[in-house]
Amino acid sequence: MQFPKDFLWGTATSSYQIEGAANEDGRGQSIWDVFTHAPGTVKDHSNGDVAIDHYHRFREDIRLMAKMGIRNYRFSISWGRILPDGTGAVNEKGLAFYSELVDCLLENGIRPFCTLYNWDLPYALHLRGGWLSPDMPEWFANYTTIVADALGDRVKDFITINEPQCIIGSGYALGVHAPGLKCCAADIVRAAHHLMLAHGRAVQVLRAHVPGVRVGYAPCGDPCVPYTNSPEDIAAARKEYFTVHIDEKVGPAWNIAWFSDPVMLGQYPADGLVGYEQYLPDGWQEDLKTIHQPLDFYGQNIYQGQWWRRGADGKPEHVRYPAGHPHNALEWPINEDGLYWGPRFLYERYHTPILITENGMDAHDAVSLDGKVHDPNRQDYMHRYLRALGQAVADGVPVLGYFYWSFFDNFEWAHGYQERFGLVYVNYQTQERILKDSAYWYQQVMATNGENL
């Protein structure tokens, strides 16, 4: 398997899921601090107050990354650690933490990729409306300015927003993630618009404040995978992938085109406007000029895929997985072809290099009697998905890199600590770190630039 010589092999994490130190050094509350302390919100009744204590252990954690051969690492910044109230006074201790983190990465030969927003909105801003507020884009631009000025001399790779669909879909439509709202379609559409406008303002700030910056955006979604390689099934899968279905309950919260076309093409998808234009804020057409900023890469978080084919009526038809089809511990179906067709369809539509910002497998890992963590299913998952990604590269899709989610086991949002995605096993009682077998396997993949796949 051949990957470009400058292919970016890496791993990813996010602030709330690993940092801990929730009440230390001036950090302000986030919506996840409040949400996880409410009864019934997290399956194992846990929270991220301590998480894996990365805030205090980042130096040893980064040394572990270097030992494993990691050369690219995507982390996110806790907005409330920088600005406890979301706006106003800057917490210098928070800035110092991220500055030291970046220095440590660079000292260990690791290139930092900074995600500005990975779901942990300052609670003070939620009380002022959160993503429902039209002021959010400017609040986000102000926060981005502070980060850019503090880190931009050393960090040149930024991702504005991680998984906008989950932010809106899980947090504002279904209410299963912070802030736990179940909004009407009108509010969902407006919140999504404010989020994309915030992305655009952040790109403008980064271009103005960070010389030589490279900027991307990281939506998610389950690619529609052709059931067969027939032209009819390929066309059906492509059509379904980008179709906006009108849903007055959740709006366009989970749609890839609704959250990508404005950013990448400068327009909302026409089929979505049929149902949702009535909910967009005044001046939305003018806002598109800000939302649509030139990007250096288009990030994608891909874990699975769904089969589609041309139905007897000529329309796309979903094909269910048969009994016994492999799934991960979260019951997400394993379909490696998603990491072929997703990048291919997305590049055909957006004509921007693709960066796989997340891909990984959840399992209920445990330490064996020999003191090691054996996870052959994760190795097989990665092997299959990376071969599919390599085929996309061979077929002409410009894929810049692959970031495995996640480097560590961590706090997995509403699932708490029972689900483990990491290459590194974490004992949450002792904070011991153990490299899993998959970590050593991925080490060899990175060392050979994928030639051993």
Predicted features and spans:
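Aromatic- and Gly/Pro-rich amphipathic surface segment
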Residues: 29-63
